[in-house]
A protein has these predicted regions:
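Basic/aromatic-rich interaction segments and small domains that mediate binding to polyanionic partners
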Residues: 11-49
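Intrinsically disordered, low-complexity, charged/polar segments
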Residues: 36-89
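Short, surface-exposed loop/strand segments
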Residues: 8
Length: 89
């Protein structure tokens, strides 16, 4: 079972990440945010992820995820469950 804020990655993907929000029925889930390797745009509240199609990100995958966010000028705030722009000086 996934917990709110868990960072997941789609099985057999090249870097399709999502941040778990809640279950939607028995076999689907809703995410706070979604980011795919082929579109660096981060989208909010994507539906229709099948539970069987994702897994909890490994340490290596987490590093990859956070680096991708950083490259886009973003960061994950685990406390507020928001993707935020990194402030510039």
């Amino acid at each position: 079972m996934f917990k709110k804020g868990d960072i997941l990655i789609r099985n057999f993907s090249m870097g399709d990440f999502l941040i778990f929000k809640e279950y939607d029925g028995e076999d689907e889930l809703v995410s706070y945010w979604d980011m795919a390797f082929d579109r660096p745009v981060v989208e909010q509240n994507i539906r229709s992820w099948y539970v069987d199609s994702v897994h909890l990100a490994t340490e290596w995958e987490l590093e990859w995820f956070f680096e991708d966010l950083k490259r886009e000028g973003l960061r994950w705030n685990a406390k507020t469950k928001q993707v935020e722009k990194i402030p510039t000086m």
